[in-house]
């Protein structure tokens, strides 16, 4: 597969894909915006604490690989970045809105069940039911230009198998989780996290509006 992203590259691209949909008024993102998005505590696994220089290094590498492009010029005092990873004018990778939502959530959080993905991707795309989530995952797993996701072996006590993206190479199944409480509470945790994401983004928008009013 021609797409081979490191963990940090996957985080940066996932953040840009997410913000392009959820906060379009703040997109493209500056370096500081990307740092904030990479290090935010909601909808991220693992939570990171990247420095500006670390993020800048990833941005430079991704620009060289044509996965991102810089936006500058009249009206832009600082360089900003937008993704060319998918659905760009000259790129080969074309994804539907549902596919973008799932891929983004997998890039940001790693392996997840369809139920977790539906809750956590809700800010990007509203799936009508679980069947739509599962059919979209199957499409991503069986695309001629893919596969882009893989279904992992079901863990003991879990009702659903987890899926993982393949943009960082082949995936080895992680050791099985035996904590039954984790299995039972997974969907509830995902719904709580989705609400936390929504609150954080509303706060971010409010802060941005207040900053503009103060100018």
Swiss-Prot record:
Coiled coil: none annotated. InterPro entries: DUF480, WH-like_DNA-bd_sf, WH_DNA-bd_sf. The modification N6-acetyllysine is found at residue 80. Keywords: Acetylation. SUPFAM superfamilies: Winged helix' DNA-binding domain. Pfam families: DUF480. Belongs to the UPF0502 family. HAMAP family: UPF0502. NCBIfam families: PRK11239.1. PANTHER family: UPF0502 PROTEIN YCEH. This is UPF0502 protein YceH. It comes from Escherichia coli O7:K1 (strain IAI39 / ExPEC). The lineage of its organism: Bacteria, Pseudomonadati, Pseudomonadota, Gammaproteobacteria, Enterobacterales. The gene is yceH.
